[in-house]
Curated annotation (Swiss-Prot):
It is found in: Cytoplasm. The gene is groES. One of its GO terms (molecular function) is protein-folding chaperone binding. It comes from the Bacteria. Together with the chaperonin GroEL, plays an essential role in assisting protein folding. The GroEL-GroES system forms a nano-cage that allows encapsulation of the non-native substrate proteins and provides a physical environment optimized to promote and accelerate protein folding. GroES binds to the apical surface of the GroEL ring, thereby capping the opening of the GroEL channel. InterPro entries: Chaperonin_GroES (IPR020818), Chaperonin_GroES_sf (IPR037124), Chaprnonin_Cpn10_CS (IPR018369), GroES-like_sf (IPR011032). HAMAP family: CH10. It comes from Cupriavidus necator (strain ATCC 17699 / DSM 428 / KCTC 22496 / NCIMB 10442 / H16 / Stanier 337). Its main location: cytoplasm. The keyword Chaperone applies. The keyword Metal-binding does not apply. Heptamer of 7 subunits arranged in a ring. Interacts with the chaperonin GroEL. Keywords: Chaperone, Cytoplasm. This is Co-chaperonin GroES. Belongs to the GroES chaperonin family.
């Protein structure tokens, strides 16, 4: 991927939701909600403080994160739909 986010921006790839419920009902693609979890593919250098130093981000490449349903800006890169969002749009990191 040839995409380098700036400042406190993060590139996230949505993770697919389950297409079958616990009771075995299959959910068609057009009825499923957008996933609110994703994998961090790239991070920017961070925001700058008052002295011009970068403040490192709390997330890192490979983290599985939770975010709001409408967070980020959707972009298509090399045929993949990705989200560009600020770190503050990420609500949590999912521990494996």
């Amino acid at each position: 991927m040839n995409l380098r986010p700036l400042h406190d921006r993060v590139i996230v790839k949505r993770l697919d939701n389950e297409t079958k419920t616990a009771s075995g009902i299959v959910i068609p693609d057009n009825a499923a909600e957008k996933p609110d979890q994703g994998e961090v593919l790239a991070i920017g250098p961070g925001k700058k403080d008052d002295k011009g130093n970068n403040i490192a981000l709390d997330v890192k490449v490979g983290d599985r994160v939770l975010f709001g349903k409408y967070a980020g800006q959707a972009v298509k890169v090399e045929g993949q739909e990705l989200l560009v969002m600020r770190e503050e749009d990420i609500m949590a990191v999912v521990n494996k």
